[in-house]
A protein has these predicted regions:
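Residue-level detector of transmembrane insertion/anchoring sites
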Residues: 37-38, 116, 165, 271
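A short glycine-rich beta-strand->turn/loop micro-motif centered on a GG-aromatic cluster
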Residues: 150-153, 304-318
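A cross-domain feature marking catalytic cores of carbohydrate-active enzymes
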Residues: 125-127, 151-154, 174-176, 214-217, ...
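Gram-positive cell-envelope targeting signals
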Residues: 1-70, 300
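N-terminal, intrinsically disordered, polar/charged segments of Gram-positive cell-envelope systems
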Residues: 44-118
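Catalytic domains of cell-wall/extracellular-matrix polysaccharide-remodeling enzymes
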Residues: 181-279, 283-299, 305, 319-323
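Hydrophobic alpha-helical membrane context
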Residues: 35-36, 138, 187, 293
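Active-site beta->alpha N-cap acidic-glycine motif
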Residues: 93-191, 196-209, 299, 315
Length: 323
């Protein structure tokens, strides 16, 4: 082989070696590129998963946050349904009585016939609710005064006022459903049937049957003799045996009869006991009572009296039974 041919062969071999090296480099570069692409894809997939997971967690938190008010609302609804069992704790308005034990409980005594040293007017309003009840509530709000409503079913279209009064912190008592002397005093059973009827209506409004009652005409009424001799002597004992307490009064506005506003004020402000259970009416037609209330309240408040609603520990006025 000539020197030229040998040199040419060497050159060809060199070119082949260089070409092989170049191919290897390209192959390595391709492998690296593929690895980089795979790594990028893996990072993208992982990032996408992380984003989705974060979004999922965020949505769960948002959903939980949205549900919290609903849960609170549900809890409030449950509390309202059991209002007669437990309510008004902690920062409860001191002028509103603790009503957790106001439901009738046979065998549990209610009230005391001993007056407290505190100067208190227990304003009581009979024979409502009616078209006058809202005006009475507005006046009580204005003077931050609490009262007790001995309600009947004579005007059932106003029964929502029972809950309205209760929600404002006033006490609800029962005065029989019909307030019909001939009906309620026909017999002991007749009285309790009528009382149960008003109890059912009150329970529908405030969630329980209260232990506070007032007899039509008071326990000392004599009209009951016309229907059943001796019935009041039986009833005053039987209502207490069944867990109720009956409330008469030791002060009256005299609005059971037709009186002017001035006459009502003069009569209602003539009492000076430490504890005054004051009889008034919020029934239909008692507009003069509504007009007299501001002056009555102002009079007693100026003398240091507080207007409170009856509760289980309040003073109880009992008249002498005449039948």
């Amino acid at each position: 082989m000539s020197d030229r041919e040998e040199k040419t062969g060497k050159n060809d071999n060199g070119k082949k070696n260089k070409g092989g090296k170049r191919n290897k480099i390209v192959a390595i570069e391709m492998i690296i590129l593929v690895l980089l692409i795979m790594t990028a894809v893996a990072i993208f997939i992982q990032r996408d998963k992380s984003v989705k997971e974060a979004a999922k967690i965020h949505n769960q938190k948002a959903k939980k946050t949205e549900q919290t008010p609903q849960a609170a609302q549900k809890e409030n609804e449950i509390e309202e349904e059991t209002e007669g069992t437990e309510e008004e704790t902690g920062d409860r308005d001191a002028s509103v009585p603790d009503r957790s034990n106001f439901a009738v409980q046979p065998g549990v005594p209610v009230g005391t016939t001993e007056q407290s040293d505190e100067k208190i007017v227990y304003l009581t309003l009979d024979d409502g609710p009616s078209d006058n009840t809202q005006a009475v509530l507005d006046i009580l709000d204005k003077y931050n005064a609490k009262a007790t409503f001995f309600v009947t079913g004579e005007m059932p279209e106003y029964k929502d006022m029972i809950k309205a009064a209760y929600d404002k912190g006033h006490t609800i008592g029962m005065h029989t459903y019909s307030h019909d002397y001939a009906k309620v005093y026909a017999s002991v059973d007749a009285y309790f049937q009528d009382l149960d009827q008003i109890g059912q209506m009150v329970q529908e409004e405030i969630g329980y049957v209260p232990c506070f009652i007032r007899f039509p005409g008071g326990s000392s009424n004599t009209v009951s003799k016309k229907y059943t001799a001796g019935i009041m002597s039986t009833l005053v004992q039987e209502v207490q045996n069944r867990g109720y307490q009956y409330y008469d009064w030791n002060g009256s506005s005299g609005d059971g009869s037709v009186r002017t506003t001035e006459e009502l004020v003069a009569q209602a402000t003539s009492f000076d006991s430490n504890n005054i259970i004051l009889l008034c009416h919020d029934s239909h037609g008692k507009q003069t009572t509504v007009e007299a209330l501001p002056q009555i309240i102002e009079h007693y408040q100026s003398l240091g009296y507080t207007f409170k609603a009856l509760d289980r520990d309040s003073f109880v006025a009992h008249h002498g039974v005449n039948n």
